[in-house]
Amino acid sequence: LPDATDQKEISHFRNPVYRDKMMVFPDLTRFTAKYNSLLSDSSVLGYYFHLYIDRRFFKDFIPEIVDFYDETGQITDIKEKISTVYIRNFQTYIPFEKYLTEEYYYGDYTKMNTYLVKRYLIPLNLNPQIINPGINEVQYGNVQQILDSLHEYLSVTEDAVNDLKVFPLNKLLASLEQYTIEFLSNPL
């Protein structure tokens, strides 16, 4: 649900102070300050888990696999100043305008979807009738639409994962599994 909106700054509880950064990740304390009393609801806990994984992904994982450079060749984290991206695993420099495209970053997501669903046995037939326990930042009424979109994302074959251009698959899997273990051992 947090990704099914154009208002990701709101749905991901991002701190507006960091709006100019390339990596803007969820501020979990903003979420728990508002919804701590609802965390016993499985959909709210799932929302929190999503934010936790996003935070770890953007704060810890992405900086290990790519570097962002300005036009003078200096590393920068200011989005407006980035001109070049270095993809470490593939030892490739690309123009920043190509990075967030289907050819690279977003394309890797597409190529991984079917593989990840099968690897982690992610159920696809979920009940869309989820009652909103009091969350204001996402639309619980959009669940069926999200599930329909999920099926569209699975149109690529499982072996498409062998053609990633940004993400080192084994490192990504190890990181996601580690983040999940850490979350489960201490969710709050």
Model regions: which residues?
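N-terminal leader/auxiliary helical segments
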Residues: L1-L188
